[in-house]
């Protein structure tokens, strides 16, 4: 390694190439060996030699690529999508998720970009401006240090959606990622991240992966949707009966039902509730249909 390169993770595992130049490798077999991650590259060292994957050529970490039954039998692996339309699969057994988190950190930590927070709050567009910021990734959150001295924490399991767009930012058109999450697990907001296409692709991989975990349709009544829309707009759970002109017992019953279907979560036994990512997605869709 050069003086500017340092080791981030090092372990034993297995790896294979699932896609080469855009073509699925149906006969691919796992190779056992050493897997090393530095701040500049991933090194895959096996009995057949050593392979280097420069981090600058990583486009993102995608979903499963079960090109054959041998691959499908492995429950946990990281799919590394490269710029040459190739995909490498890496598995470190029980340490795979930790490796994936460290890889995202190596790709994104201390990256400077422009952030608008909150761009949307409770469904209402704000007049906030884009500011310079730096980001840091760990296993549970994306931390954003703003140039004005403030900090924004995006809990990864709280991401409701991550939508790629192209917007004008300070006079230039840039790739922008619109990320829906909450502030203090309470108010729904959207934070906009503007950066170069390479960083945007990797950040989208991270946040889309988390957002997909909260997807799933739930059949709700119109009254239940009204309750969700009120919560989404920032109305306190204690204020719902008066705000919607409903009986307290009826609201309590709706809260019970929405907790059961994993749309709300209980905060205190006094029946204070807060929206989960699935609930925010449903409420947002219902508002758009109004």
UniProtKB/Swiss-Prot annotation:
Disruption phenotype: Mutants are unable to switch the direction of flagellar rotation. Flagella rotate only clockwise, resulting in exclusively forward swimming cells that are unable to respond to tactic signals.
Keyword ATP-binding: no
This protein's record includes keyword S-adenosyl-L-methionine: no
Disulphide bonds in the chain: none
Subunit and partners: Interacts with chemotaxis (Che) proteins as well as flagella accessory (Fla) proteins.
Job description of the protein: Involved in taxis signal transduction. Essential for the ability to control the direction of flagellar rotation. May have a role between CheY and the flagellum.
Protein name: Taxis protein CheF1
Organism (species): Halobacterium salinarum (strain ATCC 29341 / DSM 671 / R1)
Gene coding for it: cheF1
């Amino acid at each position: 390694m050069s003086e500017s390169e340092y080791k981030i993770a090092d372990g034993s595992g297995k790896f294979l190439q699932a896609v080469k130049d855009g073509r699925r490798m149906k006969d691919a077999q796992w190779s056992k060996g050493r897997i090393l991650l530095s701040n500049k590259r991933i090194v895959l060292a096996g009995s057949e030699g050593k392979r280097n994957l420069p981090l600058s050529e990583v486009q993102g970490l995608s979903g499963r690529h079960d090109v054959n039954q041998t691959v499908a039998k492995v429950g946990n692996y990281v799919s590394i999508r490269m710029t040459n339309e190739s995909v490498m699969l890496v598995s470190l057994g029980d340490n795979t998720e930790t490796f994936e988190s460290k890889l995202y950190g190596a790709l994104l930590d201390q990256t400077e970009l422009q952030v608008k927070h909150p761009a949307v709050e409770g469904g209402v567009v704000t007049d906030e401006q884009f500011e310079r910021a730096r980001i840091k990734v760990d296993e549970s959150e994306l931390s954003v240090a703003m140039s004005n001295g403030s900090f924004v924490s995006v809990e990864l399991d709280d991401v409701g959606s991550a939508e790629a767009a192209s917007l004008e930012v300070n006079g230039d058109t840039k790739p922008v990622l619109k990320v829906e999450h909450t502030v203090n697990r309470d108010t729904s907001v959207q934070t906009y991240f503007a950066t170069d296409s390479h960083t945007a692709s990797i950040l989208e991989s991270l946040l889309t992966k988390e957002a997909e975990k909260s997807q799933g349709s739930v059949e709700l009544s119109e009254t239940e949707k009204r309750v969700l829309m009120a919560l989404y707009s920032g109305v306190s759970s204690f204020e719902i009966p008066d705000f919607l002109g409903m009986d307290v017992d009826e609201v309590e019953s709706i809260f019970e039902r929405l907790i059961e279907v994993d749309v709300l979560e209980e905060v205190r036994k006094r029946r204070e509730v807060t929206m989960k990512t699935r609930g925010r997605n449903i409420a947002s869709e219902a508002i758009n249909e109004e």
